[in-house]
Amino acid sequence: MLVGLARAGATEPSRQPGGETLTIDGKGITLTFPEDGPTLRIGGKLQLDYGAASLRQAGLPEPFPENIAVRRSWIESYLSYGKVLEVAFQYDFAEPRRPINDAAVAYTGFANTLITLGNMKEPFSLDQLISDNATLFTERSLADAFAPARNFGLALGHHGTDWTVAASVFGGNANTGLTREGVAATARVTTAPIRTDEAVLHLGLAGSLRDLPRDAAPLSLSSRSEAFLFRQTFVDTGDIRDATTIARLGLEAAYRTGPFLVQAEYIRTRVERSGAGPLSFQGGYIQASLVLNGQGRAYKLAPDYGATYAVFAGIVVPEAARVTRGGLGVFELATRFSALDLDDGSLRGGIERDVTVGLNWYPDRNIRFVADYVRSHASPSALAGGRTVDADTFIGRFQLYW
């Protein structure tokens, strides 16, 4: 149905017997009730990954158990009531262990302020807070291993004309138990000293401190080398059974001018242990992209709910560029260097560095094809018992979202 919509465009809003208006377009299915009543929108996404990888060292396991897999298969629903209430629920049919993503309710009655309760992303890391629909590559950087991502909690956010602040308290994830992972306090502040239609300069600082319960599952940190299809991780701390707290500090910077965008982050993580000294890990990335025949990514200061403030949105395909209108679509080139250091003292989780180059093609609205090449170097690698691992990976994605 949605591919057909991409070809034909949005349907005309239809008036229902009770006065409701039903619209089907690139944003999904929207039902609007009259007289300042609620608005219900149903959308979703499908991400299909395919690829191949080779390891340069002999004697290591096959990198991909299969060469094609569904990365995400979401259905999403959003309910707005006047200017005071936002409700969101997202369910991923491709993730049996953690199918619930956002499940939150937000009060929006105060000016420029959001109060949100539910399962949502903690306000940490620009890369993590950008929507899965709009990430530059198929996967986020190696440093995303440190991002707390989604948990259940309470977040308070506020923004001005060029700045944002979000503070929050979180427990565990709604899928695995709200009390199993302790309690975290997470906050993020951003400023955009340059913010015009042509250029944006973004600066951000985030911090998170999580107290871990003694009966919690052991803490571990790892990364799948920027490709979902990998069977095993190249770097992995394994179980840190005596961890008592985990603290994270993140620095962000990004600059967009016209179709060019450069973005970087550095994250440092410290794990306190009972009966042993603390462990320190670090990671970061720098990435750049250039839209070859279209507009650059827009800067979105405030979300509809939650704490995903000050992020870059996806690519907009102009009407004349749509393949269904005789155009060629929009093309975007991208490159990234990322690094992750999980070595400290006697804990040898490994050090990995990746270089990625990619091409994104947006043939029409709500459709994207991604082609990435990733060159990975891990030395030492937890996968190879402390030896070096080098990998060459091609990963592609077909993405449909509405």
Roles of regions detected by a PLM:
Residues 27-213, 281-325, 332-334, 338-345:
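Outer membrane beta-barrel
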Residues 13-22, 61, 218-402:
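Outer-membrane beta-barrel pore domains
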Residues 1-15:
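Cleavable N-terminal export/targeting peptides
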Residues 10, 191-193, 197-240:
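Long, low-complexity, intrinsically disordered polar/charged segments
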Residues 5-6, 51, 271:
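Hydrophobic alpha-helical elements and their junctions with loops/disorder across both membrane
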Residues 1-2, 19-21, 28:
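Generic N-terminal initiation segments characterized by hydrophobic and/or small/turn-forming residues
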Residues 3-7, 24, 402:
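Generic detector of low-complexity/intrinsically disordered segments
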